[in-house]
Amino acid sequence: MSTNEWIRFVRSFAKSTCGLLVVLCAASTAVGQTGNTHPLDPAIQIARQSLQQSQRSVQDYTATLVKRTRVNGELPEHQFMAVKIRNRKTMDGQLATPMGVYIKFLKPKDVEGREVIWVEGQNRGQLVAHESGFKNIMRVNLDPTGYLAMRGQKYPLTDIGIENLLLKIIDTAQNERNYDGTTVQAYRGARVGDRACTMIQVTHPVKQPHFSFYRAQVFFDDEYNLPIRYVSWTWPETEGGEPVLEEEYTYMHLKLNVSLTDRDFDPDNPDYNYP
């Protein structure tokens, strides 16, 4: 998908979502806290079931990850990445399969061709990367949380992946469950590209220090029961203004259980361009 195609997708998606909000508002779920229940409870249950399913039956996957995150107040252009991710697996409380990550940056032009590999428990916990173009002269080993690896990033590479996204969603929702002031709505019939989804929208109309966002939307693929898009906004800067986009992640062309091997996370793989 080209940058222009992505822009058209976002615009058409925004229009269709607005229509969806109008049409389904009366049928959506929007509840306030009562007794020991909370409006987030159904969303937490959906996320937990999704995580359990992934941990049980998804070994690995490939996708085109499109992301944009605000860093130091600046919102950059979308980054497009071809990713291979092997999920972490345990057996009898012991690590059986370490998480593995391979990323090849596709866009924008200034990062096109950059490759990054990280494997849990290997290379002293460091990622191994190389730059693109004429700067591709050496491999570098970097602390995932260090300055160089975090430059232009909101989260470390070790936080990537659908299971980590689900863990973040569950953790955030569990914390917010301690407070009033949350509205939750569910919309069927949403789409991400050609994938049919159910969208869960969480809104905090009144800004409070214990809330990290104004509105967040999670799109669960109806076939896979996995979140393939997450987007959040902070509160409008002026009364009656538009919410401020904070971060968005979309997993396009997702393929599950593609039998990735250790070779897929080896910088010496001849299919890669490591020097």
Q: Model-derived features: where do they sit?
A:
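Boundary at the C-terminal end of the N-terminal hydrophobic targeting segment
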Residues: 30-37
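Bacterial N-terminal signal peptides
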Residues: 16-28
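Bacterial N-terminal signal peptides that target proteins for export
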Residues: 2-18
